[in-house]
Structure formats: structure tokens, C-alpha cells
Design a protein with these regions (language model features):
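Active-site loop-to-helix junction immediately N-terminal to the catalytic Tyr of the SDR YXXXK motif
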Residues: 9, 55-63, 75
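Active-site helix of classical SDR
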Residues: 29, 65, 73
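Short, flexible catalytic-loop segment of classical short-chain dehydrogenase/reductase
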Residues: 91-102, 155
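Residue(s) in the substrate-gating loop at a strand-loop-helix junction
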Residues: 49
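Alpha-helical segment proximal to the catalytic Tyr-Lys
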Residues: 34, 78-82, 141
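Substrate-binding pocket helix/loop in short-chain dehydrogenase/reductase
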Residues: 5-6, 10-15, 113
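C-terminal substrate-recognition "lid" of short-chain dehydrogenase/reductases
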Residues: 26-29, 41, 122-150
């Protein structure tokens, strides 16, 4: 999620951001589809971002790609449901990985984050992983075509 100004985005940068944040979802599904059909089902869990839902500025290429993840999730769910393949996405808020902390977290940004979240604590990577594990399990057998927000109540 490299920050960038609109005027600084080149076609090369745009394509690279789409490759990193969107393209692989499509081609991964394309490559596993046949074996999932042969196995009479499966589960696909994509990872989106809530940044486009909140209108995050300063990273238009990233937010465009991540909104595309939701579109792909919904299309894949429709196309693959007849083969008993469930497709969902988990849409995290600001997950405070070490990279996020090092690059962008400061006293002001954390104060603003806590002001906007219902749960006044940091969203950590393992919490996102728990949602992915749920959607990967039989406990979510009735869930497909959904994008589940994990953001401590930010949205």
C-alpha cells in the first residue's frame, strides 16, 4: 500500500500495483479451478482492504485494486458456486503489522484510528488470520459471495 499522489502515477507504476494487489487473485483462481472442480468443491478466501470503502486518499492505485478484489470475489462466487466452490473475501481495516507501525503509525495517526474504531485497540495480523480460517472451514459452509469486514468497528 505504497502512498502516492495522482500526478506521480505512471502507467508502469499503475500496472505494477495492479499486479501486486489484484492480478494474482484472478490467475490463481484460474489455475486451481480445474482441480477444485475435480475434487467436487473447495474454498477460496481473498484478502481485500477497507481503504477504498472509507475513501482513503493518497493511494488511488491501491484502493482501485483492492476494490477490484471484492468484484472478483463476487464474480468467482457466481461462476464457481455450481461446483460447490465457496468464494469470500476478508476485508481488513488498518492491520498494524510491523511494516505499518514502522512506516505510518505515529501518535496522531493512532489517536485518530482509536477515535474512529468502536473497539479501542490495535487490529493485529492474527485477528485477520482467524477470519480467514473461519471462512476456510466447514463452520462457514453456508457462506459464499460475501466480503467480511474485520476492522474493530471502523466502518
Amino acid at each position: 500500500d505504497t502512498r502516492h499522489k495522482i500526478d506521480d502515477v505512471t502507467e508502469e507504476y499503475w500496472n505494477e500495483r495492479m499486479n501486486v494487489n489484484l492480478r494474482h487473485y484472478f490467475f490463481t483462481v484460474q489455475s486451481v479451478k480445474k482441480s477444485m472442480i475435480e475434487n467436487k468443491g473447495g474454498v477460496i478466501v481473498n484478502i481485500g482492504s477497507s481503504s477504498w470503502m472509507v475513501g482513503q486518499g493518497g493511494m488511488a492505485a491501491y484502493t482501485a485494486a483492492k476494490s477490484g478484489v471484492v468484484g472478483l470475489t463476487r464474480s468467482f462466487a457466481r461462476d464457481l458456486g455450481e461446483f460447490n466452490i465457496r468464494v469470500n473475501s476478508v476485508v481488513p481495516g488498518w492491520v498494524l503489522t510491523q511494516r505499518q507501525i514502522d512506516l505510518w503509525l505515529n501518535e496522531e495517526s493512532e489517536k485518530d484510528l482509536m477515535k474512529n474504531q468502536c473497539l479501542k485497540e490495535r487490529l493485529l495480523p492474527h485477528e485477520l488470520a482467524q477470519a480467514v480460517l473461519f471462512f476456510s472451514s466447514e463452520q462457514s459452509g453456508g457462506c459464499t459471495n460475501q466480503s467480511y469486514i474485520v476492522d474493530k468497528g471502523w466502518l
